[in-house]
């Protein structure tokens, strides 16, 4: 029922404006120093940079799309405990649960232009590799619990391969092969 509510609510409340995040540069009355200080205070297992891209996304979600942000925060209250339990089972950093916000804006029915589906944005082949059932009636990529389990397994595997959370996260987004290519192109520097 939550999936159906989300689809209808987000369709009805869609922000009238869409943004090309590659070319837009938002302005805010909040000084950069405030954002920088808040990011520094966050306890994280990875380095959190602050740059124009990060600033743009902070402004987008906090100032340009407050309704969507409110919906995402509401969904987080429901789904994050499920993700925490799953990620704890795999002894993963709990902060990785926030990847569902980045991947899909907490939309269990999200579909990317490339064909990735669900909250955790699994491509068909990767979903099958991690045991998600997909046929003409069922697509477990759209199941937040089962896809979170697959995401945790993928992240654990990626961390075992790369030994670095930044690379494991990059691998989740673009695939291990592309991360390996980038490492080779950089002369082994990460």
Where are the model-predicted features located?
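Active-site-adjacent helix/loop patches that line small-molecule binding or acyl-intermediate pockets
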Residues: 176
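Solvent-exposed, polar/charged alpha-helical surfaces in well-ordered, non-transmembrane soluble domains
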Residues: 74, 81, 85, 97, ...
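An acidic, Gly/Ser/Thr/Pro-rich helix-cap/linker signature
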Residues: 1-90
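Membrane-interface junctions
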Residues: 89-92, 161
């Amino acid at each position: 029922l939550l999936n159906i509510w989300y689809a209808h609510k987000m369709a009805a409340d869609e922000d009238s404006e869409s943004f090309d995040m590659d070319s837009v540069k938002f302005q805010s009355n909040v000084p950069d120093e405030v954002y920088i200080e808040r990011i520094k205070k966050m306890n994280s297992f990875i380095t959190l940079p602050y740059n124009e891209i990060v600033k743009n996304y902070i402004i987008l979600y906090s100032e340009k799309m407050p309704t969507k942000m409110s919906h995402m925060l509401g969904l987080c209250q429901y789904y994050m405990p499920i993700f925490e339990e799953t990620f704890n089972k795999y002894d993963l950093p709990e902060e990785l649960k926030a990847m569902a916000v980045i991947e899909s804006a907490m939309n269990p029915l999200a579909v990317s232009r490339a064909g990735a589906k669900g909250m955790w944005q699994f491509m068909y082949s990767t979903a099958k590799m991690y045991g998600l059932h997909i046929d003409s009636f069922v697509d477990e990529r759209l199941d937040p619990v089962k896809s979170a389990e697959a995401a945790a397994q993928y992240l654990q595997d990626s961390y075992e391969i790369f030994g670095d959370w930044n690379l494991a996260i990059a691998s989740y987004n673009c695939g291990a092969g592309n991360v390996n290519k980038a490492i080779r192109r950089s002369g082994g520097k990460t």
